[in-house]
Each structure stands twice: as structure tokens, then as C-alpha cells.
Amino acid sequence: MEDDVTTTERLPAPPLDTASKRVGFISLGCPKALVDSERILTQLRAEGYEVAPSYEGADAVIVNTCGFITPAVEESLSAIGEALDATGKVIVTGCLGERPEKIMERHPKVAAITGSEAVDDVMGHVRELLPIDQGAFTGLLPVAAPGMRAGVETPQRENTRHGDVFAPSVKLTPRHYAYVKVAEGCNHTCAFCIIPKLRGLQVSRDAGAVLYEAYRLIAGGTKELMIIAQDTSAYGVDLRYRESEFQGEQVRAHLTDLAVKLGEMGAWVRMHYVYPYPHVDRVVELMAQGKVLPYLDIPLQHASPKILKLMRRPGAGKQLDTIRRWREICPELVIRSTFIVGFPGETEEDFQELLQFLEDARLDRVGAFPYSDIEEADANALPGAVPEEVKQERLARFMEVAQRISTEKLSEKVGRVMDVIIDEFNDDEDDQPGTRLIGRTKGDAPGIDGQVYLYAGDFAGLVKIGDIVRARIEDSDEYDLFGEVIEKPEWKPNVPQLGHFGKH
């Protein structure tokens, strides 16, 4: 889609340099943008560019921006300005790049602007700004994923709306978890959202490509996979669920088929951005069987049928029945969701309906945001704007209920023994190294949910970041758990552990 990529006037090519060049990188926005950053970094490394850890010594900087809500736009513009001040050579990519006039108005000296998911375009600008002899670096391209059928020497490049890309082998997350993006773009027309305008309609990856990426990650030591898309439950719709090869079998591009195969690999598999479609029941059954983590991240947004209709959101009036059915299938299911309060037209009656839904559904993890206009969103034109002070008052009331429910639900876990994946150490100065740990249960995603604060006890110094331990929960508060390690079982995935992304 040519119209989706806008660039400034191309700079004249400098003379070829055989020395390696250093590129700084700033990644902003959601996990889906993080995966785009990983793809760009993978290609930079493959072509022989060094990634600078700071502005100092960077020959140019790439800024992967967010352009969704106003604060994110401002953060992106500020980051671009900071990078320009530091290096003078900045390539802008990501969602805000789909609105180049906004960038050029503030920063006319940027070297180039591309849209989102534009690896090839970004790399073209990097080569123009910082040409190097790439002949010596062809061996750094990603090699075949372990488990590929005989005769396949390199992973297939996948088509995107801006060209084709490799699945990333450079990760920006800690080694023990990774985001796996199964689709780009969105087919929904939510009144408050502009993602389809920024990232286009949904484009799903073939199931084989996703599964080979997951296999390679687990072979390299990744223990937790976060499956993401704008609408993960709609994965494969645009492909008409076509089949593709994985280890000699044909696998449909469908969420349930993908979940079955991912579950067979033995890692933690966590589902994000899931809409309550009927086939999600089958995924919940896999959760009950222990094949997929009993966790669903569902963006419900509201509970009033009137407001959901104004938002152009699906599922009005059926949300509670769906949640009850899922919990009957999998009693251990943890549900997280986000909501918007103060949407145009929201009355006190609508808000009370939302609060009652929260009481009835007793969601485990909840986030909420006051509505704010987003440039180009259809909701901006709706009548019945809610005053800012009313939005904030409703937000406070909403979060008070959500916090109480969270406190009650977490208190039910006290006394239980739970699996916890370790994310970091939390030692005091006088502690033996590895005495205090911070991790997450199967019901907690990194960065957005609660944590578990653990005392290692007899296992002090024996537990590493990324280990999965058994812990007895001894206390809780509004959002977090506290306990002690009682066992450190060996992790045994169903994927050969190579310690690197090499050929099996």
C-alpha cells in the first residue's frame, strides 16, 4: 500500500564505508509496536549495523512511535526532538508515521518518515544515511528454526502491507518471555479507535510461520509466549483459515488450531486481546486441560448496551453470560479487561450499569481510562460530552469497586501453592544474593498485572531469573501476592533446548 508510507525528500547517498555504523533505537507504544521494533533490530543486526545503547556514539536514531492517544503522540514527538538534538539524524517509523504532517510541523529536520510495520522502508533509509559494506554480514541472517522439515535452510519471509519480513530473532523482552504477533491491523470500526487508519485492516500470518517462531523461541530458552494482535480471536479470518506447513503437518490459521499446537510445546502460552467469539470456548477448554494458561485479556470497554452501541462494540448484553460459561469450563480462569468511563452520551444510569456489571462479573484484573478525544476518531462528533470532572469522579468510583474486588479475589489465594515465573531479584543490601524475588503467577501478564513477592528461603542463590518455582502464598494486598519458595522443579518443554537459534 503505497499511500501508507510517506517519506521526506531522500538525502544524497554518502560514500560507501566499510566500518560498522551505530544506530540508536527508541521503541514506544504497545507490545505490537515492540514486535515491529524487534523486527527492525533483527534486520539491522543482520546487515551489520551495531545497535547503540544510548545517544552517545550513535550515528543515527530510529524512533518507533505511537500515534493512538494524545499523550502518546506528545511522548513520541518529544522523543523525536530529543533524538534530533542528540544526533541530528532521525528516522521516524510506527503509528505516528502514518500522520507525517504532524511530525513535520514540529520536527521538519527528520531524515525520513515511514508508517507502521515498515521494516524494508526503514532499512532503505538506514542504508542511505549510513551506507556500509554488507557483504561480510550475510551469515547473520536468521537460520532455520529447529524442527523445520529437511531441506528448509532459512525461515520464510512473510508478506506484510509494507513488504516482507523475517520473524524477529532480536528480542527486547527478557529472555524468558516473548511477544508473538499473529496478525497486524484490525477489521473493527470502533468509534473511539483509529487503529485501522494507522495500521490498516487485519493481515494474519500463516500458522506455520507463527509456530516455527514459537518453536525457535522455546528452543532458545523462552518459557512464556504472549500471543498478541489487535483482535487475536479473529486470527486467520482474512486468510479464510488456510492451512500451512509445520513439521510436516498442515495447520489451519485459526485461533483454536494455533492454541492446540502451541500448547503441545510445553511453554506458558498467554492469550491477549481476545474478543468473546463462540470459538473462544474451545480455547478455554484447552485452559482447563492445562495446555494454555488460564488467562484471557478481553477489552470489554463498557457494559451498557446503549454505550456499547455508540462505541460500535460487539457483544452488548451477552458479556456476563459468556464470562459465567467460561468459568464453568475453567474455574481457574483469570480475566483481565479494560474499560472507558465518561464516553459521550454516558449517563449516571449507564455508569451504574457498568458498576453493577463489575460487581456481577468479578473480573480479576481491571484497568480503566477516562474518555478523551482522539484525532480522526468518529466518537469525537458524538453528542453528550461528559464534563471532565464527572469523568474523573466516575473513574475514581469505578476503580474503588475494582480494587475491592481485586483485594477479595487475591485473598482467596492465600494458603495455596502456585507456580511463579521469576522476573527479577529484589534483595536488600544485607541479603544473600537471590534471597528476595519478584515474579508472576499464571494469572499475571508482565507490565500490566500484579506481582508475587517471594522469600527464597532454602533456595536463596539457587533461583535464576526466568525460573518457574513453586511458592506458598502467605499474604496479599490490593494487587499483589506475597509468599515463599518451596520447590524449584526442572522445566521440561517439549522442544529441544539449544540455547541459541540454531539448526536442529
UniProtKB/Swiss-Prot annotation:
Residues 411-487 form the TRAM domain. PROSITE patterns: MTTASE_N (PS51449), MTTASE_RADICAL (PS01278), RADICAL_SAM (PS51918), TRAM (PS50926). InterPro entries: Elp3/MiaA/NifB-like_rSAM, Methylthiotransferase, Methylthiotransferase_CS, Methylthiotransferase_N, Methylthiotransferase_N_sf, NA-bd_OB-fold, Ribosomal_uS12_MeSTrfase_RimO, rSAM. It catalyses: L-aspartate(89)-[ribosomal protein uS12]-hydrogen + (sulfur carrier)-SH + AH2 + 2 S-adenosyl-L-methionine = 3-methylsulfanyl-L-aspartate(89)-[ribosomal protein uS12]-hydrogen + (sulfur carrier)-H + 5'-deoxyadenosine + L-methionine + A + S-adenosyl-L-homocysteine + 2 H(+). The keyword S-adenosyl-L-methionine applies. One of its GO terms (cellular component) is cytosol. This is Ribosomal protein uS12 methylthiotransferase RimO. It comes from Deinococcus radiodurans (strain ATCC 13939 / DSM 20539 / JCM 16871 / CCUG 27074 / LMG 4051 / NBRC 15346 / NCIMB 9279 / VKM B-1422 / R1). The gene is rimO.
